[in-house]
Design a protein with these regions (language model features):
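Catalytic cores of DNA base-excision repair glycosylases
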Residues: 1-126
Length: 126
């Protein structure tokens, strides 16, 4: 585990790898440390429910995005993915308050981001 004084000099992924090696500390926890304690600007916690839900709401998707596909889509937001996370969390807040504007037109090509859901057998669909 790196000493606190070492952290500013380390890359985000190196910090994630080294700290999440500690039993009980996962990637999400380290990403929150990077964002809120170290002020890193290019972190998008794609496993965060709020980030995924905000993306679903903002882009008018029916299903939740898969984390890997969301990470790929979010490459265009670098080097400001932390800011994107904040806006995605805010989209959830606005939706709950009834203030998220409805999307007009087709959503961008993000269909591949939806999680696959098991469809019911034909006999049960009636």
């Amino acid at each position: 585990v790196p000493a606190p004084a070492e952290l500013p000099a380390l890359a985000d992924e190196e910090i994630i790898e080294r700290i999440s090696a500690v039993h009980g500390i996962g990637r999400w926890t380290v990403e929150m440390l990077l964002m809120f304690q170290l002020g890193r600007r290019d972190v998008l916690p794609v496993d965060d429910f709020g980030v995924c839900n905000g993306f679903r709401l903002a882009y008018g998707l029916r299903g939740m995005p898969r984390p890997k596909a969301l990470a790929k889509y979010a490459e265009r937001w670098a080097p400001e993915r932390t800011l994107a996370a904040w806006y995605l969390w805010r989209a959830v807040d606005l939706h709950r308050a009834g203030k998220l504007p409805a999307r007009r037109g087709k959503p961008p090509r993000v269909a591949q981001l939806k999680k696959k859901t098991k469809s019911a057998p034909q006999a049960q669909r009636r």
